């Protein structure tokens, strides 16, 4: 598990525990090497939810979408927000593959349904890898039997590894809280390293929860949590064809008085993995966290934060350990969010660099040392409005260029 702080503003009842996506009661997962990757690494994963599970999804905003994305969205809509499992293959995006892409996704879920004894319409599929490359179906189909056989309540780690592409590390999380006199758990796994940008980009995230909820309530919770996590990260500003978040919930009903706490836990879990993705950005040496305060509203604050953390000039300044506050303010100014420049205050770590829109005297060497941290915190105050927002990214290094010059997307 990547050690990323949850960074919650309010007191949280949620605590980190072990177990990842199979930590919640009743969930099983597996990950195997089916030969989809030339490297021989794990490349196929399965997450199975208990009966009566509800599921909510969030999908890429790109108009160029893999067939599996549309299949997931259509099945969730047709089933009223219910699903039992998701199959994930790594190595081939199965995007821009014509009619074959949809046919292969349907064949894969039907074959898996036969293995599990379930209706194919209750199964989802996600693919990640090289765009334009179809799934090698004979290998995938041959891998279903051992994949199902490997399902277990301890299979979350194997699943977390099997979904990776250019990631340096696997990413998983599990949280636990006492709600209504009983233990509730939330688990998750994710992948993503490059082509990460707000509005869900080249990343996959899968979550589980052992509380029973109405599908519409769960869908609203997932939407809010995604907006404050995966839609608040950027590595390189590129958006993908396959990015998907799927969140399953199944268990004893949870009283509505605890729904806010559950949404808080789901947000914390997603933020944990979102920051892990940003920290694992291709060629990255640090995580950048931008906090915006005093905006007109939360969406405005988030937009400014995302613009700053996505600025190539800001990212390269951080990599060069250069406390160049002008790049930060300039990025905020082009965000499209109205604010009064004469009210701006700016901090890098504990060092205040601006007040009332004017530069302050500061120790550049001390500020530069802050930029050498594993997590670089930038805070900007736009005014006295109620809107606050967070976004995460990473620095931009020459290693990023080398990685993407050598790897076919």
Curated annotation (Swiss-Prot):
<feature type="site" description="Cleavage; by autolysis">
    <location>
        <begin position="201"/>
        <end position="202"/>
    </location>
</feature>
<dbReference type="GO" id="GO:0006526">
    <property type="term" value="P:L-arginine biosynthetic process"/>
</dbReference>
<feature type="site" description="Involved in the stabilization of negative charge on the oxyanion by the formation of the oxyanion hole">
    <location>
        <position position="129"/>
    </location>
</feature>
<dbReference type="Pfam" id="PF01960">
    <property type="entry name" value="ArgJ"/>
</dbReference>
<comment type="pathway">
    <text>Amino-acid biosynthesis; L-arginine biosynthesis; N(2)-acetyl-L-ornithine from L-glutamate: step 1/4.</text>
</comment>
<feature type="active site" description="Nucleophile">
    <location>
        <position position="202"/>
    </location>
</feature>
<feature type="binding site">
    <location>
        <position position="404"/>
    </location>
    <ligand>
        <name>substrate</name>
    </ligand>
</feature>
<dbReference type="GO" id="GO:0004358">
    <property type="term" value="F:glutamate N-acetyltransferase activity"/>
</dbReference>
<feature type="binding site">
    <location>
        <position position="191"/>
    </location>
    <ligand>
        <name>substrate</name>
    </ligand>
</feature>
<dbReference type="InterPro" id="IPR016117">
    <property type="entry name" value="ArgJ-like_dom_sf"/>
</dbReference>
<feature type="binding site">
    <location>
        <position position="202"/>
    </location>
    <ligand>
        <name>substrate</name>
    </ligand>
</feature>
<keyword id="KW-0012">Acyltransferase</keyword>
<keyword id="KW-0808">Transferase</keyword>
<comment type="similarity">
    <text>Belongs to the ArgJ family.</text>
</comment>
<comment type="pathway">
    <text>Amino-acid biosynthesis; L-arginine biosynthesis; L-ornithine and N-acetyl-L-glutamate from L-glutamate and N(2)-acetyl-L-ornithine (cyclic): step 1/1.</text>
</comment>
<dbReference type="GO" id="GO:0005737">
    <property type="term" value="C:cytoplasm"/>
</dbReference>
<dbReference type="GO" id="GO:0006592">
    <property type="term" value="P:ornithine biosynthetic process"/>
</dbReference>
<keyword id="KW-0028">Amino-acid biosynthesis</keyword>
<feature type="binding site">
    <location>
        <position position="409"/>
    </location>
    <ligand>
        <name>substrate</name>
    </ligand>
</feature>
<keyword id="KW-0963">Cytoplasm</keyword>
<dbReference type="InterPro" id="IPR002813">
    <property type="entry name" value="Arg_biosynth_ArgJ"/>
</dbReference>
<feature type="site" description="Involved in the stabilization of negative charge on the oxyanion by the formation of the oxyanion hole">
    <location>
        <position position="128"/>
    </location>
</feature>
<dbReference type="InterPro" id="IPR042195">
    <property type="entry name" value="ArgJ_beta_C"/>
</dbReference>
<keyword id="KW-0511">Multifunctional enzyme</keyword>
<comment type="subunit">
    <text>Heterotetramer of two alpha and two beta chains.</text>
</comment>
<protein>
    <recommendedName>
        <fullName>Arginine biosynthesis bifunctional protein ArgJ</fullName>
        <ecNumber>2.3.1.35</ecNumber>
        <ecNumber>2.3.1.1</ecNumber>
    </recommendedName>
</protein>
<comment type="function">
    <text>Catalyzes two activities which are involved in the cyclic version of arginine biosynthesis: the synthesis of N-acetylglutamate from glutamate and acetyl-CoA as the acetyl donor, and of ornithine by transacetylation between N(2)-acetylornithine and glutamate.</text>
</comment>
<feature type="binding site">
    <location>
        <position position="165"/>
    </location>
    <ligand>
        <name>substrate</name>
    </ligand>
</feature>
<feature type="binding site">
    <location>
        <position position="282"/>
    </location>
    <ligand>
        <name>substrate</name>
    </ligand>
</feature>
<keyword id="KW-0055">Arginine biosynthesis</keyword>
<dbReference type="GO" id="GO:0004042">
    <property type="term" value="F:L-glutamate N-acetyltransferase activity"/>
</dbReference>
<keyword id="KW-0068">Autocatalytic cleavage</keyword>
């Amino acid at each position: 598990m990547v050690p990323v702080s949850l960074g919650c503003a309010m007191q949280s009842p949620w605590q980190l525990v072990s177990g990842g996506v199979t930590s919640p009661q009743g969930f099983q997962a597996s990950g195997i090497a089916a030969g989809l990757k030339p490297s021989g690494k794990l490349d196929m994963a399965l997450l199975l939810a208990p009966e009566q599970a509800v599921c909510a999804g969030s999908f890429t905003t790109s108009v160029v979408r893999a067939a599996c994305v549309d299949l997931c969205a259509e099945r969730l809509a047709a089933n009223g927000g219910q699903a039992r499992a998701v199959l994930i293959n790594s190595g081939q995006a199965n995007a821009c593959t014509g009619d074959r892409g949809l046919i292969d996704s349907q064949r894969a879920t039907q074959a898996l349904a036969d293995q599990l004894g379930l209706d194919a319409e209750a199964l989802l599929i996600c693919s990640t890898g090289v765009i334009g490359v179809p799934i090698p179906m004979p290998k995938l189909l041959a891998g279903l039997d051992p994949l199902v056989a490997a399902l277990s309540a301890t299979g979350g780690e194997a699943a977390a590894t099997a979904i990776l592409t250019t990631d340096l590390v696997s990413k998983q999380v599990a949280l636990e809280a006492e709600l209504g006199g009983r233990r509730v758990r939330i688990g998750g796994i994710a992948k993503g390293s490059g082509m990460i940008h707000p509005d869900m980009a080249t990343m996959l995230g899968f979550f589980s929860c052992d509380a029973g909820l109405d599908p519409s309530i769960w869908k609203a919770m997932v939407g809010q949590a995604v907006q404050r996590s995966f839609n608040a990260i950027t590595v390189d500003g590129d958006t993908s064809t396959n990015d998907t978040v799927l969140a399953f919930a199944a268990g004893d009903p949870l009283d509505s008085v605890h729904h806010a706490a559950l949404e808080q836990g789901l947000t914390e879990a997603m933020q944990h993995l979102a920051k892990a993705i940003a920290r694992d950005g291709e060629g990255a040496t640090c995580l950048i966290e931008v906090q915006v305060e005093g905006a007109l509203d939360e969406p405005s604050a988030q937009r400014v934060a995302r613009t700053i953390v996505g600025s190539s000039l800001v990212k390269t300044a951080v990599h060069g350990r250069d406390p160049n506050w002008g790049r930060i303010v300039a990025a905020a100014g082009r965000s499209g969010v109205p604010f009064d420049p004469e009210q701006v205050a700016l901090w890098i770590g504990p060092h205040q660099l601006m007040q009332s829109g004017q530069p302050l005297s500061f120790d550049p060497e001390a500020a530069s040392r802050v930029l050498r941290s594993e997590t670089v915190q930038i805070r900007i105050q736009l005014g006295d409005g109620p809107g606050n927002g967070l976004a995460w990214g990473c620095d931009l290094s020459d290693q990023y260029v080398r990685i993407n010059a050598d790897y076919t997307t």
